[in-house]
């Protein structure tokens, strides 16, 4: 009965989508694959998870209850920055990291534009039709959202989420995280070359398709 009460067990229950692999779930929640394999095996033996052409949660009400528990826990221990990056995986809606977070994801964490831990925005693209639902989701964790970055002085906490609504989302996955396509990410970095020159050099070494020889337009932009 208590198999789902551990931290990693709860994260697996919340992040699992029908058809997921063990590796896919591990990447989603930024955990070691072997650790998650043992967790999934335990959940499968207890009857919470089944494998049929991918992993499946037996009873979706368990996921709903887990999210309620996580919400209550956040009242006592608010999400850290690293935990905030995992939270969108639990929303059950399509999204993709965009802007400076797309650069961060495509460089596999190798390039992080200066962001103060006390004033830390996350940037995600969402469906226009899901905008209100995303706002409600982050409200459960008392994380403010807006379509443009809010001044730190207007916030009670350090984390905010900047939602970028789109009619459609084209997403790729890098290390389990959904992110806008590489071509779009490079175009964004080119547009803000003054901030992302080093990132473009890094992307050029990581991916053969990246062209870093364009005529860049330097801008002074507050993200």
Give the positions of each predicted feature.
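Active-site nucleotide-donor binding segment shared across nucleotidyl transfer reactions
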Residues: 73-138
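A short, conserved structural fragment
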Residues: 44-54
